[in-house]
């Protein structure tokens, strides 16, 4: 019977990946379609992808598949053949190829069955996620972005918007997509007569968001086909001016792809122009924040003096201090509230008041 999960430690796998010289391609894809038996589909896909040395993160649910992976370049055609043949709905599915890629994005294959391929918190049985808005390609995006009767709505999280977004795009300030959906409806209630353009990294969130807006009475709803990744690729191929400024945050070791030369964010510690995300090196924190090279050296990769000092303690004492802390913090903390508390960054309302 084939092994259907990884048995090697993360540390060893990451070291192997960093030492690997074989060229890899980072790619993402998603598809909303009905999978009758997600567990069987997951197991079959795992066996095929494991043989091809595919690394990355893939979620499978009854509603479809969502994947961010890296594939050896010499096995890319075999990977496409396996994927396209895995289900009729995935034949010729669009693949978003990374814009900036050193092949070091992932080091292990994690293929999991989930309730949803993107956590939306929705339990309204009358909601039809297949009834989506109109796709927009790069040329239409550029045409509509300057239209006063059109609003661009960013359906990504606060830390993604902070380092890059479409010109004049509206931020829906939240830590999670599930919170953003009802928030977007509320924020845009007085704009139901306008064109609403939703966008996200690769298309999966804005596609579902467009369906949710239509479900809530909005009529003229669009979403950027393939998200920021596909828009930037097509705009460059077609020689179109880029209407996205800054960096596109990505959920792998790279943490970002440069779209334009603009640096629109600031170091969370000193305020210098910077858009480089990192996780605090203290295992008891792992706060996601923006840190410039100078502060990285000063704080030794930590988000605060407290974390820097804790990192110097003996391992056993560090473990004792971590005991009882929230489990989520140990992995990857992206909370805006904690970011503001730890880094002393004012909330948007406070910042606006101080500027007046």
Curated annotation (Swiss-Prot):
- SUPFAM superfamilies recorded: Rhodanese/Cell cycle control phosphatase
A GO molecular-function annotation: oxidoreductase activity, acting on paired donors, with incorporation or reduction of molecular oxygen
Give start and end of each Rhodanese domain. 146-240
Q: Which reaction does it catalyse?
A: uridine(34) in tRNA + AH2 + O2 = 5-hydroxyuridine(34) in tRNA + A + H2O
Documented EC number(s): 1.14.-.-
User: InterPro entries, per this entry?
Assistant: Rhodanese-like_dom (IPR001763), Rhodanese-like_dom_sf (IPR036873), Rhodanese_C (IPR022111), TrhO (IPR020936), TRHO_N (IPR040503)
Please state which protein family the record places this protein in: Belongs to the TrhO family.
Q: Fetch the PANTHER family from UniProt.
A: TRNA URIDINE(34) HYDROXYLASE, UPF0176 PROTEIN YCEA
One GO biological process term: tRNA modification
In this protein, the active site sits at: 200
CDD domains assigned to the protein according to its UniProt record, in alphabetical order: RHOD_YceA
Protein name from the UniProt record:
tRNA uridine(34) hydroxylase
Q: Which PROSITE patterns match?
A: RHODANESE_3
Q: Which Gene3D superfamilies match?
A: 3.30.70.100, Rhodanese-like domain (3.40.250.10)
The record ties this protein, via Pfam families, to: Rhodanese, Rhodanese_C, UPF0176_N
Per the entry, what this protein does is: Catalyzes oxygen-dependent 5-hydroxyuridine (ho5U) modification at position 34 in tRNAs.
Q: What UniProt keywords are attached to this protein's entry? A: Oxidoreductase, tRNA processing
Q: Which domain of life is it from?
A: Bacteria
Extract the coiled-coil ranges from the record: none
